[in-house]
Swiss-Prot record:
Family, similarity comment: Belongs to the universal ribosomal protein uL10 family.
Protein source organism: Pelobacter propionicus (strain DSM 2379 / NBRC 103807 / OttBd1)
Annotated Pfam families: Ribosomal_L10
Name of the protein described by the UniProt record: Large ribosomal subunit protein uL10
Protein purpose: Forms part of the ribosomal stalk, playing a central role in the interaction of the ribosome with GTP-bound translation factors.
One GO MF term: large ribosomal subunit rRNA binding
Alphabetical keyword list: Ribonucleoprotein, Ribosomal protein, RNA-binding, rRNA-binding
GO cellular component terms, semicolon-separated: ribonucleoprotein complex; ribosome
Subunit annotation: Part of the ribosomal stalk of the 50S ribosomal subunit. The N-terminus interacts with L11 and the large rRNA to form the base of the stalk. The C-terminus forms an elongated spine to which L12 dimers bind in a sequential fashion forming a multimeric L10(L12)X complex.
GO BP of this protein: translation
Signal peptide: none
Length: 174
């Protein structure tokens, strides 16, 4: 590959890394072809881009982006997973493969919003509910006070009617 091709690859990867919400690095050494194919398919289903990229070129592409802090982890065979939408779903898929006892897939590090994540933090991210579940929970908690307020407002006229009915019944007895 000539210098111009390498420069074009670095430019393309720099643009991808600049757009990324999260980036994860892994060592894929010793993975079976079937397992690697399965990993790629699951990541594709989670809208995650997965590539094996030369470390020196990846280091150059990361310069000037939020993921510049990955440089110390660029040693040995390195695969990069780039998430543009939901970092939690990417972490879930990668953690699942990293936990597989038969596999050789090892997470190295990750970057989320410019912050470096170690393996335990990636596992913690993977344990979070998905984006859709978090949004549903947030909307439910935002809706609860309004629902309670409407319930109180609806109960006030009923309470007034019961009080007036009790007063009418008391006067009727006298």
């Amino acid at each position: 590959m000539n210098r111009d091709n390498k420069q074009e690859l670095v430019t393309q990867m720099h643009e991808r890394l600049s757009r990324a919400k999260a980036v994860f690095l892994a060592d894929f050494r010793g993975m079976a072809v079937g397992q690697a194919t399965s990993l790629r398919n699951e990541l594709r289903g989670a809208s995650v881009e997965y590539k094996v990229f030369k470390n020196t070129l990846l280091d150059l592409a990361a310069k000037g982006t939020d993921v510049e802090c990955i440089s110390p982890y660029l040693a040995g065979p390195t695969a990069i997973a780039i998430s543009y939408d939901d970092p939690v779903s990417a972490a879930k898929v990668l953690s699942k493969f990293a936990k597989d006892p038969a596999g050789k897939f090892v997470l190295k590090a990750g970057v989320l919003s410019g912050k470096l994540l170690d393996v335990t933090q990636i596992q913690a991210l993977a344990d979070l509910p998905s984006r859709e579940v978090l949004i549903a929970k947030m909307l439910g908690s935002m809706q609860a006070p309004a629902t309670n307020f409407v319930g109180v407002l609806a109960a006030l006229p009923g309470s007034l009617v019961r009080v007036l009915d009790a007063i009418r019944a008391q006067k009727a007895d006298n």
